[in-house]
Amino acid sequence: MKLGILAVGHKLPDWVAAGCAEYIKRMPRELPLVVQEIKPEPRAGKNREQLLAAERTRLDAALANYGCIVVLDERGVDLSTLKLAERLEHWMREGGDTAFVIGGADGIDPAIKARADDSIRLSSLTLPHAMARLVLCEQLYRALSVVRNHPYHREG
């Protein structure tokens, strides 16, 4: 099984890449975490629906290798770290590769949301794209540490 973060966007600042790389490195060999950048559609003369449809085509191609799709959405379920750990454990039991989709500036196409197995949000706050990617990497590592009883996460 592997976890994938499919993020619509451009190359992020070095500090974000370094932070993500640190948590990716900490993941065990049997549960690798990969980040794949999906090229955003150029805005020139296109409306929101056209932009999302073009990005959907790219996301669909990347999602073909994943059995479970989780979208990050501001209207998604608000999970605590322990609840995310429970979901991660469930996805691990299912055994298929799991993709986490972070949309671009205009969000995620409704067709991707409709076929997603789950919809979660990282925070009630609006996070910049770079921060969302880094927070997701850290939270997946933290959730795995809870599942594995590793001392990284401390309750209370």
Task: Please tell me what each predicted stretch does.
Residues 1-156:
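Post-transcriptional modification and biogenesis factors for structured RNAs
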